[in-house]
Amino acid sequence: MIIPIKKIILESLQDKIKHKVIVYGEAHFHRDEVDRIRNDIIKLKPDIIIHELPEDYKFYKIHLPSTRFYQLERGLDQNIYKYFKGDYKKQFEIREKNMLRNIDFVLSDGLVKMPPKVVAIVVGDTHLRTIDTPELGPKSPFYNRDYIIIRSKYKEIKWLFQLRR
């Protein structure tokens, strides 16, 4: 039986390499929050940045040119908003599963190329909710991982519900 080399490498490295993964919850529409997170990430100098907003790529390429940048929602079918119009619970479930799948892919790909020691992830703070809600479903699946999570001071989920009233 022939075992692919990538599988052998991944299996041998999994026990030895531990990533320090820091997830920032961002209130996207608060400029001070965006700037604070950007400054934190620049100081952190992570090996990889995984970001929900692809437009931040240009900023990080200027300030951290050797850091690898990945889009968090790569491969997401944008039609979910049409298929599940108004069903935020289903939209969030699909999006968050896709996000975690992309994170797993990036980390496993990184193991083969160059093991990342520090990974920064930026996601809307609502995706880091600590409570179940009828509108958005169960608490965030990000808490099922061994990640350091830094929430927004604005607690975007509260802000989201205020908008709807």
Residue ranges: model-predicted function:
Residues M1-R165:
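Compositional signal for N-terminal targeting/processing segments
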